[in-house]
Amino acid sequence: IINIEDNIEFNKLYKARDLYENKTILLKVINHNNHICEDFLANLIDESTIIREINSPYILNMIDVGVDYREDGIWYYMIYEYEKGISLNNIIEGNYLHLEAIISIATQILKGLEAAKEHGMYHGDLNPSNILVDKWYNVKILNFGVTKANHGVNIRSGNNIKYLSPHQLCINYTDTESDFFALGLILFECIFKKLPFGESYDEEQMLKFIDKGINFNALKGINGNEELIEIIKKLLNRTEKYSEFREVILDLSSIMYEKAEIKESLLIEDEQNYKYETKTKVTKNRNKLLLISAIIIIILSALTTLII
């Protein structure tokens, strides 16, 4: 192990060195808990094969999985190809994310989820610690297959239930709707630096928070993000909601298209103003030259008359 890339309790990501292959890798370690089923590892091996078949540029490629029995407990590990970047939760905590960056990150996550769905997969544990982002805002998603390998039950690493959907909390059922809901939470956090329903380690309490809803009127930082907030509302809505990842991608694209149109119109306006100002300046300079020429002619005429 070279260093810790990300450190969430009982859910650690390390930068490590594969001594056999002599290459740098990422190592994800999960501590065993009561939510993890007996055949989890065998199922995870099968899921890792499917993940490799997906071959999406937005999903971090899983090389191997295994288990380590130690005195302090059972630790499952997943070996990934090395990619530079930091987890999205570190970016959210430390930086202001502009609208274009948020939309770019969200679009890439959606494309990864869409590719997985085409292979009959969902994520089921989507949260900022499982999203790797580089300095150009390129995204790689980790932990695909973990929830599915656990028979659709989220493993709740470190008792983290903040990003679970209502039906995951209520009946331990996971599907693509869980990923829509988790993405809504992540996007909300990207804008407001906090989760919409608060935090709790108690599942019943978390459900009560969700049932209470969100008072968007009390939030600061909405200006300029209205269109994105409408998408977030639909992602978190339990009735009028998205059914396809492509729908969300199109809605996000329309925001960027509108921004591009506004920017283009401003550029055209600036260009027109520049041309007008340049033309006005040229006209004024020409008039000045004509006036100076006329004065010179008058002076020369007067001097000629005096000499004669």
Features from the language model and the residues they span:
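Activation-segment/catalytic-loop signature of the eukaryotic protein kinase fold
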Residues: 65
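Activation segment signature within eukaryotic-like protein kinase domains
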Residues: 105-106
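Conserved end of the kinase activation segment
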Residues: 167-177
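Protein kinase catalytic-loop region centered on the HRD/HxD motif
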Residues: 111-121
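AlphaC helix of the eukaryotic protein kinase fold
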Residues: 35-53
